[in-house]
């Protein structure tokens, strides 16, 4: 054993003890936790805002910006208190969508489009708040640089609101706080390894303090809504493992609004968070993802009515005619109650109706689902008088006691509207509970997978499961083979494996023999061990990580090591866990298959040799059989060339061999094709030359497969 294992163990020890890249650079504290505050007045205790997300304005798809005129038309009818643009403002990709870069023309288009929306929609520009998404940081080496067009063309930049935390307060009979968080990378790694939001300890603390700020200074209740680009499932923990969810629960926010995942995944990515705080108090909040403008043209109207939060989503494929948003009672399936423990029954029905037409009549009907949805009550609603010119709130009183029920979905509400053109419009039927009960529907598995699984943790599970499996696959069979290789009993056992019918041998006999025979070639086994250890600790490849013509960076399993513009430092472990889009496909689809296929080629080589050996032994006399019994399994297949030179076959037949070998070679070709496909995508993303000149990623898997296929060609009689 001493002759086989010291080298790889020494290499493993060396790589483990080697200083690994560490986070030697962080954003400046002021940038990391800076806060901007804005205060706007409102009338009464009902406020509404509009959210748009994932605009993806593109040079190659001008209709995305042009059709934002539909949003401007809608805003004229809605007249929201705020317009929130939650990230991915520009697309920042080429026409083939294979590489990323910042395009100033897209940002100029965005600025012009917003100016047009302001003129068309009649909204005060200072009430528009936009934040970065991951696409807005593709290829931005540092904030404030020449490629950081958000700092030049965004609405927030025009009002000097470039802090990572934006706090907005609407003040009326109650106070409503909207808090925006920019969790994009300070060093903008290019596509595809820029997928997650990245929180920091200082930013989380800044959010915590800011959510308390207005509460400590207000004499009226404060309802809090937080917005950002990234869902919580795609937001990484801070350096000390802190997360926003506990802060949101502790500060009793009502909802977190986000984008990022697009409507192609689902138009109902909603999640109810229940978290037990340090004081052993259970708190909760909703997380509502809004689908994209890019392909789906989605817009959300969100309202707060006395602390109750509700919303409705619209697809703006054509101009918005009339929108009906029931602000109270809220939908018992997906709407939030500010504090269910302090819930008090309200004898109100409140509805916001946004329309370009004059509204003539509004009524609400209550249906009983336990009685085949028969109408229980029809209630007329009246426009609430207001000092402001545009406050489309309709109200009615009812006896809420009549609708007490043990079921949160027994009673359903629908609103009917008649406008001045005689057009009748109705809202969607939705359940309600006057007691604040909830009936959260079961999510489809795709929604659960993307929106409720914490992908930062899932990455660690998938990554280390793969690495543990790979290390076991390399070392355990080698140890077994080392102990039994010189034993005649092993050679007899190997012969018995082949001589007995397959059905008489259990699968694990074949598996053990396959793994042990696969490790017989010392050069290949050592090469695979050193390669895997290299992937764990050393750089995989080099590339232009932060801009098309920027400095060369290195990608490790733990993230990117990128030269930082100030002080000559290195920003390390950047884009972690974002690199999962590179590492997991490579490990699962290339590295593990390469090892298994190499094992298979050498095991198949041994099978062919043993079968030929048995035929020769059976036809030889007993003396020759006794003389040759000590060399049943040759160390190198090349030795066969000297023993069986009288029956040469063509090189192609020798190379392809049996059907088993042909299947293995076909699998090698498929694995090589997958590998080359992954490499070509990375070449497009980070530069052809540096990727080609990165042997660990580009060349070693192919060389291992080609070498194993060549060395296992068996020359037999």
Give residue ranges: language-model regions.
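Short beta-strand elements
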Residues: 425-453
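Active-site glycine-centered loops adjacent to acidic/histidine catalytic or metal-binding residues
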Residues: 54, 87-88, 133-134, 229, ...
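Alpha-helical transmembrane segments of integral membrane proteins
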Residues: 458-717
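Solvent-exposed serine/threonine-rich low-complexity stretches and specific carbohydrate-binding patches
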Residues: 372-389
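Extended active-site neighborhood of metal-dependent phosphoesterases/phosphodiesterases
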Residues: 25-41, 95-218, 241-255, 259-314
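Binuclear metal-dependent phosphoesterase catalytic core
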Residues: 265-371, 395-433
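Short acidic, glycine-rich surface-loop motifs adjacent to enzyme active sites
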Residues: 211-235
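N-terminal active-site segment of His-dependent metallophosphoesterases
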Residues: 2-10, 14-104, 477, 484, ...
């Amino acid at each position: 054993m001493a002759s086989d294992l010291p080298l790889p163990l020494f290499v493993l020890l060396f790589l483990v003890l080697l200083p690994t890249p560490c986070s030697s650079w962080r954003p400046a504290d002021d940038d990391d936790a800076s806060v901007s505050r804005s205060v706007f007045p409102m009338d009464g205790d009902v406020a509404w805002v509009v959210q748009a997300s994932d605009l993806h304005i593109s040079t190659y798809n001008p209709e995305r910006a042009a059709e934002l005129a539909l949003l401007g038309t809608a805003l004229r009818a809605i007249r929201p208190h705020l317009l929130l643009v939650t990230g991915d403002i520009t697309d920042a990709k080429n026409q083939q969508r294979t590489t990323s870069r910042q395009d100033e023309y897209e940002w100029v288009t965005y600025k012009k489009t917003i100016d047009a929306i302001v003129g068309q929609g009649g909204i005060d520009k200072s009430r528009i708040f936009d934040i970065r998404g991951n696409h807005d940081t593709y290829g931005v080496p540092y904030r404030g640089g020449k490629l950081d067009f958000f700092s030049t063309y965004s609405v927030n930049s025009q009002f000097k609101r470039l802090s990572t935390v934006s706090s907005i307060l609407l003040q009326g009979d109650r106070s409503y706080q909207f808090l925006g968080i920019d969790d994009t990378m300070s060093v903008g790694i290019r596509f595809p390894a820029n997928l997650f939001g990245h929180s920091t300890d200082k930013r989380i603390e800044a959010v915590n303090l800011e959510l308390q700020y207005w509460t400590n200074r207000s004499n009226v209740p404060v309802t809090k809504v937080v917005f950002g680009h990234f869902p919580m499932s795609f937001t990484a923990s801070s350096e000390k493992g802190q997360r926003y969810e506990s802060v949101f629960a502790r500060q009793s926010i009502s909802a977190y609004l986000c984008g990022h995942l697009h409507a192609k995944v689902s138009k109902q990515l909603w999640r109810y968070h229940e978290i037990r705080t340090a004081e052993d108090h259970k708190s909760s909040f909703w997380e509502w993802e809004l689908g994209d403008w890019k392909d789906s043209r989605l817009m959300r109207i969100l309202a707060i009515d006395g602390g109750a939060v509700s919303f409705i989503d619209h697809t703006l494929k054509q101009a918005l005619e009339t929108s009906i948003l029931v602000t109270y009672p809220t939908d018992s399936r997906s709407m939030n109650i500010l504090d269910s423990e302090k819930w008090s029954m309200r004898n109100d029905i409140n509805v916001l109706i946004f329309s370009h037409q004059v509204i003539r009549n509004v009524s609400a009907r209550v249906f009983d689902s336990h009685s085949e949805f028969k109408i229980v009550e029809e209630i007329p609603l009246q426009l609430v008088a207001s000092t402001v010119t545009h406050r489309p709130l309709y109200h009615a009183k009812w006896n809420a006691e009549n609708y007490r029920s043990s079921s949160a979905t027994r009673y359903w509400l629908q609103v009917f509207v008649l406008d001045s053109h005689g057009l009748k419009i109705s809202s969607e039927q939705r359940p309600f509970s006057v007691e604040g009960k909830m009936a959260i529907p079961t999510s489809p598995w795709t929604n659960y997978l993307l929106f409720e699984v914490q992908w930062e943790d899932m990455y660690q599970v998938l990554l280390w499961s793969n690495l543990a499996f790979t290390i076991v696959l390399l070392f355990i069979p080698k140890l077994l083979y080392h102990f039994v290789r010189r034993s005649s009993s092993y050679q007899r056992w190997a012969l018995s494996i082949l001589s007995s019918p397959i059905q008489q041998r259990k699968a694990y006999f074949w598996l053990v023999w396959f793994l042990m025979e696969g490790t017989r070639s010392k050069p290949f086994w050592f090469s695979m061990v050193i390669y895997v250890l290299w992937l764990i600790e050393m750089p995989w490849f080099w590339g232009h990580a932060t801009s098309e013509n920027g400095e060369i960076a290195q990608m490790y399993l733990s993230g990117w090591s990128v030269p930082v513009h100030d002080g000559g430092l290195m920003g390390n472990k950047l884009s972690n866990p974002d690199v999962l889009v590179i590492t997991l496909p490579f490990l699962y689809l290339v590295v593990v298959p390469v090892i298994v296929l190499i094992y298979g080629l050498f095991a198949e080589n041994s099978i062919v040799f043993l079968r030929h050996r048995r035929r020769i032994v059976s036809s030889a006399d007993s003396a020759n059989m006794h003389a040759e019994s000590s060399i049943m399994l040759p160390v190198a297949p090349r030795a066969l060339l000297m023993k069986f030179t009288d029956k040469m076959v063509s090189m192609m037949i020798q190379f392809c061999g049996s059907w088993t070998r042909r299947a293995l070679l076909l699998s090698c070709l498929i694995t090589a094709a997958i590998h080359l496909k992954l490499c070509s995508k990375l070449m497009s993303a980070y530069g052809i030359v540096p990727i080609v000149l990165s042997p660990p990623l580009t060349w070693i898997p192919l060389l291992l497969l080609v070498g194993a296929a060549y060395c296992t060609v068996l020359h037999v009689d």
